[in-house]
C-alpha cells in the first residue's frame, strides 16, 4: 500500500500500468481489466436484485475520461498548467486546488466527473441532477461544481451535491 511512496521503481511501474490501462495499449492488461470489470458488474447486479432496483444505463469512467481530458485541455484559462499537471486553483474562490489532469496527461476523477455531467445531460436531458456521496467529499464537490461553473455553466446551475453519512 505504500510502495508508491517508498519505492521509486514500484512508483514508476504503477504509473506505467495506469497509463497503459487508460490508453488500452497492453493486451494482457486489457484482458485482466475487462475481466475484473465484468466480475464487478455481475456482482453489482446481484446486489441490485436483492434490493429490487435496476438501472437503465451505466456510465463508465472509460467513456468520460477522453471527454474530460479534452475539456480540460480546451480550457487552459480555467485549468492552468502546474508542474506538468492541469489544475483548478480553488483558493481563488475560497476553496482548495484540485488536479484535473495529472503530470502524465491522464484525467483524474475530477475531469471525469465534469464529463459525466455532460454525458448524463445528453442521455436524459435533466432539469436537476442530485449527486449523493459520502460527506467526506463535500469539499471536493464544492471545487468540482465551481470548476464546472466555468466550463458547463448551465449544468453547474442545475447540479446539486448532497453529502450523507454519520
Which stretches of residues belong to each language-model region?
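NTP-dependent nucleotidyl-transfer catalytic core
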Residues: 1-166
Amino acid at each position: 500500500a505504500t510502495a508508491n511512496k517508498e519505492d521509486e521503481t514500484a512508483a514508476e511501474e504503477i504509473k506505467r500500468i495506469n497509463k497503459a490501462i487508460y490508453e488500452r495499449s497492453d493486451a494482457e492488461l486489457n484482458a485482466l481489466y475487462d475481466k475484473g470489470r465484468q466480475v464487478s458488474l455481475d456482482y453489482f447486479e446481484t446486489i441490485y436484485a436483492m434490493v429490487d432496483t435496476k438501472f437503465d444505463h451505466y456510465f463508465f469512467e472509460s467513456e468520460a475520461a477522453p471527454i474530460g481530458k479534452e475539456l480540460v485541455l480546451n480550457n487552459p484559462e480555467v485549468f492552468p498548467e502546474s508542474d506538468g499537471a492541469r489544475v483548478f486553483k480553488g483558493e481563488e474562490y475560497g476553496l482548495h486546488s484540485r488536479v484535473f489532469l495529472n503530470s502524465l496527461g491522464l484525467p483524474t476523477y475530477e475531469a471525469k466527473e465534469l464529463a459525466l455531467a455532460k454525458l448524463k445531460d445528453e442521455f436524459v436531458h435533466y432539469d436537476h441532477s442530485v449527486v449523493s456521496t459520502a460527506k467526506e467529499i463535500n469539499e471536493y464537490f464544492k471545487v468540482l461544481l465551481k470548476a464546472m461553473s466555468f466550463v458547463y455553466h448551465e449544468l453547474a446551475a442545475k447540479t446539486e451535491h448532497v453529502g450523507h453519512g454519520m
